[in-house]
Amino acid sequence: MTLLLEEKYPIENCEPWDFCGFSYKVNFYNREDLTGIVVALDLTDHVLEKAIEEKANLIITHHPFIYNNNLEEEFANFPYKEKIYNKLVKLKISVYSLHTNFDADKQGTSYWVAKEFFPDEKPSPLGKYGALIKTKIELSELKAILRKKYSGPIMTNNKKASFSFNGVAFFAGSGDSPEINEHTTKNNIIITSDTKWSDWIFLSQNKKTLVNISHQTEELFIKVIYFLLTKKFKKGVNVSTFYYKNLINSL
């Protein structure tokens, strides 16, 4: 099953610093050994509870659960992971992630986020990870489009609501500022997430208009992988999903 995913999203496309693939793998894995699959953005205690409830022994996430070759260091930095990891071992549940190898696909994360907000448009590739919607649009119009499907916080460095742009550039997740700057123009509105103060300064100094939305929009990954798996395994393997509701709220 994971070989099927790697045919579409090759591990070779994973960044050198990334930890795509298995964070924990049970020694056996044939198709007949699968009791169920849960697809989520991240592995948390809630996702593990969902897997136990569904009697699933494979969890597929976008973000890798383990980001370190040294488990002791990983658990020291993120203590909550040790308890989850020990449960995975005890219950024989494998965890597999598709991260930058999924992002790098022509229809990767940025493509699907762009498609979510502009369903009638065809996103064009922008660098390795970005997607561009070519359209004339004002900042106020973009806000209205985002609000139709997104209720989280929206931040921008441009107060000119009526200023006209010729495209919307999506860099899903924590977009890399030098890459964003390289592949965009002053006439693009840039949409990304988790923008650091230094990135706001960098892009503002380069006269770029930035719009910051929640990283949680990457949950579109779940929909894509769920569709792929249920199309392939129409019978025999139960595929479930886990979405966070209101993980981050305004005070």
UniProtKB/Swiss-Prot annotation:
InterPro entries: DUF34/NIF3, DUF34/NIF3_sf. A divalent metal cation 2 binds at residues 63, 215, 219. It comes from the Bacteria. The keyword Metal-binding applies. The keyword Metal-binding applies. One of its GO terms (cellular component) is cytoplasm. This is GTP cyclohydrolase 1 type 2 homolog. It comes from Mycoplasmopsis pulmonis (strain UAB CTIP).
